Structures are given as C-alpha cells and as structure tokens.
C-alpha cells in the first residue's frame, strides 16, 4: 500500500500537517474549499519564478492567514513590503471579498535542494529547456546529496527524449521507506510541458524518522549546518494588528 498511496496523505497527523486548517459547516465547506484552490492557483501563477514550495492556509473567524514557503522571499515581499500589499489585494479580488482581512507570512525555505517540490520544479524547468532527462536527474541527485538528504527517488514519465512510445523511468539514491509511517517523506508531483507532450515528474525525499515523543525529525547522517551560514529569512505580516 505504501507504494500506491500518496505519501503525504498517508502520513497526515503523524509526520505531516494539513495544508489547510479550518472548520466549516456542510453549507460553507465547499465555498471555503474552492477559495483555497483559487488562492493557491493565483499565487502559483503570479509568483511562478519565486520558487514557492507550499502555501499553508488557516482561518480564524473572518481573518485569513497565509504562510508562504519560498526559496526567494525577496520576490514576494518587494521593496519595503510593497509586494505584500499587492498580493493581499490580489487575493481579496480572487475570492471576491475586498473586506476580508488577509494576513501573509513569508518564510524562506532553509534547504532548497532538500525540498521535493523545488526539486521537481527544477527538473521540470530543465526538461522544458530540452535538456536530456538522464542528465537532469543526475544533476538533481547531486544537488540533493549536497543538501544532506538521506534518500531520494525521482520518476519521470512520458515521451522521454521525444520517443514515439511513452514510458517511465525512475532512479533512487539512499533509503526511501514508503511503508514506515514515522518516516518523514516529502513528496511532490509536477508537470513539464515540452514540444513532444507533457512529462510527469514525481519526487520523494526522505529526511529522517520522527521517533515517539519527539517533535522534530532526527536525520541520522545528515550534513550539519556550516558555521557562519546564513539563517533563513522570515517576513511576518503585522499590518492587520496595526489596523485593528
């Protein structure tokens, strides 16, 4: 079953958290669910070059809280936070409610090459530039190994290198335990639009195991942070508190 099911959905509540945190009645649930879809779609299209890994949504009364995990926070924040105001107005327009309070927090991804979605996005960009898929996979593996991941699996399917018959090929380095529920496995799915058709890209990243009564992952054998390295940036939106 571990090889068939989505690794993120299998580990919800164990090592993975829900991407949307809110409760609603049976009448308002589909409306809020559609809002979440529109918000994520709008952000991914508007900031396709910002390297957004994930968008977490939380709702408290009439307030909407967003947490954007990105590799380039400066693209979203802008000069003196001007990009946040533009993003807030765009979200309000997308959901059709100009009076909705929207709070946005931008968090920089600490290890870009250890993030499954950013790795999949990198592979998709290289394939769209018509780089050979085997070379692209090898480069992605090297980047992930330098980031200190414990295991990585990459699968690419479609008309590889313009072949007439579609096929899928995969490669794995290290250990990727899909059946172990306490294993923190980051999973991502992306598509690359090439001249020969659409290629599907799947990436599994094994970061470590979460032991009982331990909240943080213990990555055995992972590469430690170098001394003097830059800490990840975080921009917290405080405009809603000041206005209220």
Curated annotation (Swiss-Prot):
SUPFAM superfamilies: Prokaryotic type KH domain (KH-domain type II) (SSF54814), Ribosomal protein S3 C-terminal domain (SSF54821). Residues 233-244 have a biased composition (Basic and acidic residues). One of its GO terms (cellular component) is cytosolic small ribosomal subunit. Keywords: Ribonucleoprotein, Ribosomal protein, RNA-binding, rRNA-binding. GO terms for molecular function: mRNA binding; rRNA binding; structural constituent of ribosome. Gene3D superfamilies: 3.30.300.20, Ribosomal protein S3, C-terminal domain. Residues 221-244 are annotated as: Disordered. Residues 39-110 form the KH type-2 domain. Pfam families: KH_2, Ribosomal_S3_C. GO terms for biological process: translation. NCBIfam families: rpsC_bact. Part of the 30S ribosomal subunit. Forms a tight complex with proteins S10 and S14. Belongs to the universal ribosomal protein uS3 family. HAMAP family: Ribosomal_uS3_B (MF_01309_B). Binds the lower part of the 30S subunit head. Binds mRNA in the 70S ribosome, positioning it for translation. This is Small ribosomal subunit protein uS3. It comes from Prochlorococcus marinus (strain MIT 9515). The gene is rpsC.
